[in-house]
Amino acid sequence: QFGPGWLGIPEFVLPPLTKVISEAARIWDSERLFWHAGITALEVVIGFVLGSILGALIGYALGVSPRVEAVLSPYLLALQIAPKVAFAPLFVMWLGYTMYPKILVAILIVFFPVLINVLSAMRAMDHDMINLARSFSATRMQVFSMVEYPTTLPALFSGLRIASTLAVIGVVVGELVGGNIGLGYMLVFFEGQGNTAAVFVVIALLPDRDRGEK
């Protein structure tokens, strides 16, 4: 609160806490802050759910079928090493200033942590357990449902935990690049106005990535 004034720090660099609080009250009503936060949350949830489902399904498919892995691995590797957020402007050009580009960026970012964790767990599977199940005449689906799937659940949840934080990053970056709704758009909007206090308010609404990874 008093640090910026005592240290001679300009308010546009570090505004006092009272100004941030008053600005939060103002934009809560006049700028529909709650609505923009809801849009960002919806994009994060949709991107996280769809990206996680795709990553898990393809991860299990690659783990179960070496042939599928041999066919898809080169394409997945090329996509994995590409910077995912760089696709945001392209998605905006294709789909316009809607929710869809942000959701696609989130899906792309979420997809790989889940895929890699699941596939790594499938590769590290104890084959003695699989052979034991087969010795009891278990079908391929039974082996997967009773042995492989339960064994890989810790890795799956670990991937989901990482992906949940990355989904927020993907959506906000998409909104920063080409958005007219959401918290990322609000950051750009208030930055253009030189309203540092409002920027701090929006940042405070974003999930804490470090806290989510603990």
Label each residue range with its predicted role.
Residues 34, 38, 42-62, 153, ...:
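Hydrophobic alpha-helical transmembrane segments of multipass integral membrane proteins
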